[in-house]
Amino acid sequence: MAGLQLAPHLPVGVMFPHNKTEAPGLHSAKHDPYEQSDSSQRPSMGHLRNSFQSKLWSNTEMEQEDEVSTRPKRNVCTKARRHSCPHSAGIRQQGSGNNAQGQGKGLFYLSSPTPRYPKANDQDFIPFRRKRVGVDRAYPLKPMVHRKSHSTSDAGADGDQNGYPRLPDSSEFSDNSFGLRSWVNSSLLASVQAEKVVAELHRTEWTQIQRLEAAGESLQKEIRRKEILLQEKLKKTEEGLRRMQKEKKQAIFQEDRELQRMVLPRRRVRDGDHDTPHKPCLSPEFRSEVFSRNRGEDQTCDQAQENPSPRQLSDYELQKLKRERLMASNSKIRDQDAGPSADAFFQPAEELGSTLQESSRSGTPGSSGSSSSTEEPELAKCSHCGRSFLSLRLQRHSTVCGKMQGSKRKVFDSSRARAKGTELEQYLNWRGPATAKAETPPPPRKSTWRQKHESFIRTLRHARQVQQVIARGGNPSDLPSILPADNPDYVQCPHCSRHFAPKVAERHIPKCKTIKNRPPPPRRHDS
C-alpha cells in the first residue's frame, strides 16, 4: 500500500471514450453488466467529458502557438508525440479480447471533433465501473507505474490485472513539448549556422574572384601601356634613322658640290701659269653651263635623291675626271725636273672643251632621249699596274706609273739622322760595311731537336750511374766515358779541337789562338 496513491474523485461512474466511433465496438450488450443502469448518470458523464476536453484543448492551444511560429517545428512535434504515445492498435485488440472473454470491462474513449494526437495506451485512461446504488463511489488506489518502463504489452497486462489505466498527465505533455522545443531550437540554430558558414564561403570566393579579375585588368593595362611605349620608341628610332640617312645623302651631295667649286678655280689658276695656247682650257659656253647647273643643284637636290637620272651619272663622270686631273697636277708639281713638257700632259683646249660639252649635254634634261643612246667611253688598261683608264688619260698615267714602278724608295734610317754632325757619325761610317754584312739574314738551319734530345737523355743516364757507384763506395772513373754529343750547330776550335756554340766560338777562337801562339816561358836556372 506504500507504493499506491489516491486517484482523483470523479463524479461520474462511466469512463468516456476517446472516439465515439470506437465506443460501440469496444463493448456490447452481452458482456457489459452495467448496461441496464439508470439514465440519471448520463448528464454527469457529459460534464466529465467536457472538463477533460477543455483541459486537452488548453494544452493543444499552447502547442499551436509554437507551431504557428515555425512550420517545420509542427512536423517534428507530431513525430515526437507519435513516438512518445503508443498507438491504440493494441488497445483495440485488448478491448475486443476482454469483451470476448466476458470480463465486462467497458473501455470508453474520449471523442473529440478534430483529434490531433494519436490514441493513447491503456495506461493513459482510467477505466470506470458503475457502482451499485447505495455504495460509495470512491475509486480504489491506483498502482504506481514508471513512465519510461510502460509499453504496449505491459499496458495490456496491467489493464487485465488491475483494470485501472491511468489518465494522461498534463506534466507529460509539458515535458515532451519542452524537450521538443529545445531540440527544434538546436536544429534551427545548427541550420542557421551552416547557412552562415556557406554564405561566408561564397562571400570569400566572390572576393577572391573580384581580386583576380582586378589583377588581370591591371596586368592588361600594364601590357597595353608597355606596348604603347615600345611603339613610340620604335617610331622615334625610325625617324632618327630616316633623318640620319637624309643628312648623310645631303652631306655627300654637298661634298660633291664643294669639290666641283674647288676644282674649277684651281683649273683657272693653273691655266693662267701656262702659255697662251693652253690658257683657254674651258670654253665660255661650258663655263656658263657648269655655273647654271651649280645654281640649280639646290632646287633639284631632293628630286635627284629619290629619282636618279642620267644627269647624275654624267656628273659623277665629270667629278671623276676632275679628281684625276687634280691628282695629276699634284704629281706634276712634285716631278717638275723629270716630268715631260706641258704639251705632252695637257691636250688642246678645243678637244677638252668638246669632250666636256658632250658629257654635259648628255646630262641635260632636254637630251633625255639622246643620253640613253650615247656610247660609254672606251677604257684601256695600264701596262704597269693593270688598272683601266680613259684613252685620253692613259698616256699620262703610263708615264707616271712607269716611273713609280722603276724607282725604289730609300729606307729612312733614323739612327744615322740622329748621329749626323756628331762623333758617332764617323764610327757608323767606319762600321758601315760590317753592319751591312751582318744585316744580311743567315740561311735557315735544319732543325736537330731530336739529336739534342737523345744526347740529353744519355747524359742523364750516365749521371745516374755515377751517383749509384758513389753510393756503393766505388770509383766513378771505372765507368766508361760518355760519348761526345754530335751537335752539328757547334763549331770546333782549330787550336784545341773543342766544340763550342757559334757565339761562344767567336769569343774563344781568338783567345785560344793567342794562347797557343804565345812563346814558352824562359827556363829558370837553379843556383
From Swiss-Prot:
Keywords: Coiled coil, Metal-binding, Repeat, Zinc, Zinc-finger. A zinc finger (C2HC/C3H-type) spans 378-407, 489-518. Gene3D superfamilies: Classic Zinc Finger. Zn(2+) 1 binds at residues 382, 385, 397, 401. Its cofactor is Zn(2+). Residues 71-85 have a biased composition (Basic residues). Residues 207-254 form a coiled coil. Belongs to the ZC2HC1 family. One of its GO terms (molecular function) is zinc ion binding. It comes from the Eukaryota. Residues 18-105, 145-170, 264-316, 352-379, 507-527 are annotated as: Disordered. Residues 93-102, 358-374 have a biased composition (Low complexity). Residues 286-298 have a biased composition (Basic and acidic residues). Zn(2+) 2 binds at residues 493, 496, 508, 512. The lineage of its organism: Eukaryota, Metazoa, Chordata, Craniata, Vertebrata. Residues 50-61, 301-312 have a biased composition (Polar residues). This is Zinc finger C2HC domain-containing protein 1C. Signal peptide: none annotated. InterPro entries: Znf_C2HC_C3H, ZNF_C2HC_dom_1C. PANTHER family: ZINC FINGER C2HC DOMAIN-CONTAINING PROTEIN 1C. It comes from Mus musculus. The keyword Membrane does not apply.
